[in-house]
Swiss-Prot record:
Transmembrane segments: none
Record's bilayer topology term: Peripheral membrane protein
E.C. numbers: 7.1.1.-
Entry-linked NCBIfam families: nuoB_fam, PRK06411.1
Protein name: NADH-quinone oxidoreductase subunit B 2
Cofactor binding note of this UniProt entry: Binds 1 [4Fe-4S] cluster.
Gene for this chain: nuoB2
Catalytic activity: a quinone + NADH + 5 H(+)(in) = a quinol + NAD(+) + 4 H(+)(out)
Matches recorded under InterPro entries: NADH_UbQ_OxRdtase-like_20kDa, NADH_UQ_OxRdtase_20Kd_su
GO molecular function, one term: iron ion binding
Obligatory cofactor(s): [4Fe-4S] cluster
Amino acid sequence: MSQARHELDWLNDEVVVSEIDVVNENVIAGKLPDVIKKVLGWGYGNSTWPLGFGIACCAIEMMAACSSKYDIARFGSEAMRMSPRQADVMIVAGTVNEKMAVVVRRLYDQMSEPKFVIAMGACASNGGPYWDTYNVVDGVHKVVPVDVYVPGCPPRPEALLQGLMEIQEMIKTGKRGLITKG
């Protein structure tokens, strides 16, 4: 019994030593940071925490995306966060007016890095049918940088989920930029 245990200990030591050698080779070759970045990107991309900022009728569709029929939890976004400090994706759903633009910017500034913004619906994207009024901001992109536009008036929950998947893909691949959905 003790001899069998001794042989297993020797086997475990050899496995540990070989794993350490692999890690050392990767560190010397500079490959380990890339592997770690990919793992972290995968984990972070599959666990985005949205901050729902529903201002108008698009908020109803945003709430529908959280229901059991569409199940936003499948994409790692379990629930909308009520604090910007706990969120990394802001979903602006609705018309942003001049007074509300200050609030949107303040919430965006309070989010931790990296942070992403989804403009949901025609009103958030370009002012919608109210674009020509005196107090409506002609698109939330004039207040905060927008990463993904979700078109529609109001957009379907599936479109919001597609926009969220675009954000996740940006996180996983390390690409960040302006993505417009048509």
